[in-house]
């Protein structure tokens, strides 16, 4: 079940909120846990629910055992819990890809191996690992109530696509009564509507542009249309994922929780490094705290720094998907981030205008690598981005103009909303009709678009 569907908006959410606030406050974590598991079952099915339940039980028990144990026993429980978490992620997400590549090398048929990827597994496994690591380090106390832990681990606003929570992000709210607050519900609903608009009005409508490019064939695009498509996909992905994150923040606020922001105007960045401090913030923090720093980070010389960056960005690519284009994407990011750290960082810092041009030129190209899984088709697309480096001529010379007729307003709106000005306007006037009336209109427009069947699944849900 997706947030941008009529059953969620008109059945699940109103019913859940009614039960959540009608029951006595001491039962709200139980309602949150059970309601979240119901939400997940409705969207992902019984098999995926069993995987989630198993990991909840394993990590709840491991947290208590680690906290109560001493010496090597604590480390043993940590390793066992991490093996369950990482092993589950590898089995469901990477085993098929690993066997496929092994089969090519050994001429062996592994086609018998088929396993469905549980919805959101990459997100909730990383959240489980963070919990276990924090308990082991003494940065968090293990939850003593299974229902409280399940409410934290399975909280439906962020379960499928983040933000990736740490217990300390919500611990205070998790252990308080969270009384009904009209102001919190109104504030949360406004955030939800902004996110819904990003998803339904922008991301879902931009999705048809890429479909049109696939229909034409990447090898037959003109260079202008290829660049137009790369920028269009960059906007689509941003408003799809950032829209979900805003909806998650809004829903959590309606329930009495304040969860971390996952995006901070990433397309206003001046470097690839800065972008990744603004995009999917909780994933970046996770890799920093649980991988980059333990590997040595920047504290042990340039070689260790390069090794740490290489491991982090290769695994960042693989986290997004089991395919070679994701590995390549992670390596491309590693190269540019290493260049910024060792070679061009000072230049970018001194030249604001040139640094923005550098970023805006590079990043749409990295999203092309991210999106096209077939490496041959990826080569075709880049041959259209740089036609002077390849054989053949740009064809369909008027194709950009035909697409501009349909998409110019989405590009204009998407670029405007990616700047700081709309956020400043919202913060200044959010209690006035200047904000509420447009939000009301956006909500009804979204309902119309959803009812007419123009929506698409969330892109990051497949990770």
Language model: regions and residue ranges:
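Membrane-embedded transmembrane alpha-helical bundles that form the catalytic cores
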Residues: 1-462
